[in-house]
Amino acid sequence: MISQFFILSSKGDPLIYKDFRGDSGGRDVAELFYRKLTGLPGGESPVVMYHGDRHFIHIRHSGLYLVATTLENVSPFSLLELLSRLATLLGDYCGSLNEGTISRNVALVYELLDEVLDYGYVQTTSTEMLRNFIQTEAVVSKPFSLFDLSSVGLFGAETQQNKVAPSSAASRPVLSSRSDQSQKNEVFLDVVERLSVLIASNGSLLKVDVQGEIRLKSFLPSGSEICIGLTEEFCVGKSELRGYGPGIRVDEVSFHSSVNLDEFESHRILRLQPPQGELTVMRYQLSDDLPSPLPFRLFPSVQWDQGSGRLQVYLKLRCDLPPKSQALNIHLHLPLPRGVISLSQELSSPDQKAELGEGALHWDLPRVQGGSQLSGLFQMDVPGLQGLPNHGPSPLGLGPASLSFELPRHTCSGLQVRFLRLSFSACGNANPHKWVRHLSHSNAYVIRI
């Protein structure tokens, strides 16, 4: 049972507010939540907070805060599951979940909340069941995008135009417009991995963790069967080996309740009949042992002239992906000592960009090809550096560096989708369209200096 539900933007602006029980302090509660959240030290943001007589439970999605409040002693895990399901529902019915789609579909969001929750009690979170009650049509605004006009793929990879879906293809609502009777039968399957790495200052690997998901978004009629074939060498646990190669191993795996696993042990095939909308077919985790080298290595060199207070940092970034692969949207964040007053730079390519901001060096590289390396020489004047104490992991107060990036068509675990088959009889005469994408991105890629 919840008292309130509200959605805030990344800046704390209220986008949606719903009071179910009338036992709250009004809209001021949303402002109180954001003030408490942003006042925490070190950017901490616990998903469960308690203030006064009220519990706040929240999740973040695409820069938005989805928050539920309750005065009762309710299991936080059940409310977190409800918020996650609400995020999926809003994405299904609005096409995608972000500040723009919420602002354009306020009436639709309130209608969904009225059907999902009655006096704070959950009635249903089924996308399929709600289709019978939701009358408001989603307002979809398709922005102009060069991705739809060029030969650039979904994640920036160059490919043939007729082999990729438009960039906004998966961002349409599952409830088709009454004026649009030609909605395509399509299914989108994404294999997404989040990579967490900690590298010591001497280059040794201290920690590595991969969190992966197979996500499905279906626009097929209900009852359509989907068959997903995974890599045959895929194995779970260290004791299981398949095939003649080293195998593609994960430590843990879990499946959606609708997945039929009868053929998983023998052929690594998943079968399911999903409702329209988005669901997570499978989650998996791999720690401490990657089948391939890390995507990036950083080689720093630091020189400090104590007399002049000049600090020189040379960074060489090497991409250890295969030559045919590439990384996109690379951003390096390097905390600097206090008192930096100037920055001069020499970059190895003209498309790079570096600047100072919020006490750190920000180095942006739009694209890096596998097997290549890029470098940057940064010189800074830090007069106050002479008085810093000489202790800690970095005596100069430099680092650690953190990297963020995307790896299209690449999975760090090696897991691939062999095939995606659909039940044609259930889809009618129209030939369904299938799209499979693989993507890895950084979660916390930290390198000590």
Swiss-Prot record:
Q: What is this protein called?
A: AP-4 complex subunit mu-1
Domain named MHD is located at 184-448
CDD domains annotated for this entry?
A: AP-4_Mu4_Cterm, AP4_Mu_N
Family indicated by similarity: Belongs to the adaptor complexes medium subunit family.
The protein's superkingdom reads: Eukaryota
Cellular location of this protein? Golgi apparatus, trans-Golgi network membrane; Early endosome
Give the main localization category: Golgi
Q: What does this protein do?
A: Component of the adaptor protein complex 4 (AP-4). Adaptor protein complexes are vesicle coat components involved both in vesicle formation and cargo selection. They control the vesicular transport of proteins in different trafficking pathways. AP-4 forms a non clathrin-associated coat on vesicles departing the trans-Golgi network (TGN) and may be involved in the targeting of proteins from the trans-Golgi network (TGN) to the endosomal-lysosomal system.
Q: Which GO terms describe its biological process?
A: autophagosome assembly; Golgi to endosome transport; Golgi to lysosome transport; intracellular protein transport; protein localization; protein localization to basolateral plasma membrane; protein targeting; protein targeting to lysosome
GO molecular function annotations of the record = protein domain specific binding
Q: How does it sit in the membrane?
A: Peripheral membrane protein
User: Which organism is the protein's source?
Assistant: Mus musculus
